[in-house]
Amino acid sequence: MLLLGVVSCGEAMSGTPVTAVNTVTSGGGQAKSGEPDPSVPRVSNPKRLRGSDPCALLTQAQLTALGLPSANKAAQAQWGEAKCTWSGDIRATLSPDTKGRGLADYYARQKAFDNFKSSQVVGYPAVWADFAHTICSVMVGVADDQVLVVHVGSVSSRSKAQGNPCGYGETVAAEVLKNLPVGG
């Protein structure tokens, strides 16, 4: 299952990615004992993303602060869940991925991406994938079995994501995390 999504976010751009170590086991991301692969970071304070409307994950005030327009476009992600895109100087897409094995699915497929780096978003494990100067996909583990996929594309040189789309994606994800209820 290929999971792609992009979201971009606000002014504060943080995050120091570390190159992920390719330690996925022959069990496809699961340890042979059936326990989760120890190389995949666990979520210590899970949030509930499952069942959320991706177009309602950011408030109007957050959209404005992030430089995103109010208007959005709902569609379906490749894996069958809803996604929402905002397009202006920045194109940002939020795509919940709540039907798989969480970040373990991404770690198991890391060689399928052009590039892959581990990161964190306000204490939640995350990865950057397929990133370049103007685009980035940020996948944030909000629970061990739920991932917020944020895909960001910088459309204009006026964009807040210009030159750091992954940092912007992390900012967007941090704003979404503020709105998610506790629980897995």
Predicted regions located by residue number:
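Sequence contexts marking disulfide-bonded cysteines in secreted/extracellular proteins
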Residues: 8-10, 54-56, 83-85, 135-137, ...
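A short, solvent-exposed beta-edge/loop patch
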Residues: 117-184
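Short, low-complexity, disordered segments immediately C-terminal to signal peptides
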Residues: 1, 7-34
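Extracellular/mature segments of secreted proteins
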Residues: 17, 61-66, 91-95, 144-145, ...
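Amphipathic alpha-helical segments
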Residues: 51-70
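N-terminal low-complexity, Pro/Thr/Ser-rich intrinsically disordered segments
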Residues: 22-54
